[in-house]
């Protein structure tokens, strides 16, 4: 899945070169046209764009830094969490046709893998632990990105961005605590504009996130044990937007 999304991102980025040329020609046609309504050009005079998106979250959640197991027969721990879902709301502020910044607040859910928690308990001397019901990991990222809109003309407008996020992390999973994290964000997407100041948005963001995990004594024995987890969630979203 990750490879497919990355390939699609490369295709989108390369295709923007030709899109920019085509869109610029449409922009020139509008300037010279006597009948505005007959031209295939979607004008956007708004400097603010508000978007609401829903999407899927792809994450491998690989752990690193676990201590040497105390069990004489350790087992593979595997991934502590798996793919999930989420959404966000954002405001994009345009400084000119090409440059903008996006502020967003999201809410994402990652499914925990209790087989991984059971493996940790086994490796550190607590067998037959009662894990209870599955409790997910919640990720609430506040993100700021700087964007370059490659072809800010016409109805199809791709963009790329880079930024930073701070994420509040929470879980009620038995014996597990996850700390807050932060890191860089890469972004690529495209807006499909209509003539009534609305748009459809497809957005792909790669979050770099390696928060600390704390395993509580009821899961690993007499003391708290910490490790790091390589979440690095890839969020693929689709949504609707409005210009102001």
Curated annotation (Swiss-Prot):
Keyword Nucleotide-binding: no
Disulfide cysteine pairs (residue numbers): none
Alphabetical list of SUPFAM superfamilies matching this protein: OMPA-like
Keywords (A to Z) from UniProt: Cell outer membrane, Membrane, Signal, Transmembrane, Transmembrane beta strand
Tree of life domain: Bacteria
Cellular localization per UniProt: Cell outer membrane
Coiled-coil ranges per UniProt: none
One Pfam assignment: OmpW
Gene Ontology cellular component annotations, sorted alphabetically: cell outer membrane
Signal peptide: 1-23
Gene Ontology terms: biological process: transmembrane transport
Spans traversing the lipid bilayer: none
This protein's record includes keyword Transmembrane: yes
PANTHER family: OUTER MEMBRANE PROTEIN W, PTHR36920
Family statement drawn from the similarity comment of this UniProt entry: Belongs to the OmpW/AlkL family.
Protein name per its UniProtKB record: Putative outer membrane protein RC0105
Native species: Rickettsia conorii (strain ATCC VR-613 / Malish 7)
């Amino acid at each position: 899945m990750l490879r497919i999304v990355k390939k699609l991102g490369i295709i989108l980025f390369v295709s923007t070169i030709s899109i920019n040329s085509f869109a610029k020609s449409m922009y020139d046609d509008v300037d010279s046209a006597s009948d505005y309504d007959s031209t295939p050009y979607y004008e956007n005079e708004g400097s603010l764009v508000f978007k609401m998106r829903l999407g899927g979250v792809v994450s491998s959640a690989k752990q690193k830094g676990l201590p040497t197991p105390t069990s004489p027969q350790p087992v593979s721990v595997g991934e502590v969490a798996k793919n999930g879902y989420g959404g966000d709301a954002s405001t994009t502020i345009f400084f000119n046709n090409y440059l903008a910044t996006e502020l967003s607040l999201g809410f994402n859910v990652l499914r925990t893998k209790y087989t991984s928690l059971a493996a940790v308990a086994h490796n550190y001397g607590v067998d037959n632990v009662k894990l209870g019901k599955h409790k997910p990991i919640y990720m609430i990222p506040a993100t700021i990105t700087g964007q370059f809109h490659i072809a800010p003309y016409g109805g199809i407008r791709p963009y790329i961005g880079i930024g930073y996020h701070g994420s509040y992390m929470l879980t009620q999973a038995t014996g597990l605590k996850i700390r807050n994290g932060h890191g860089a964000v890469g972004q690529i997407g495209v807006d499909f504009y209509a003539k009534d100041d609305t748009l459809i948005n497809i957005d792909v963001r790669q979050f770099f996130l390696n928060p600390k995990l704390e395993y509580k004594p009821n899961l690993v024995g007499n003391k708290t044990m910490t490790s790091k987890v390589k979440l690095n969630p890839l969020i693929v979203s689709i949504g609707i937007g409005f210009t102001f």
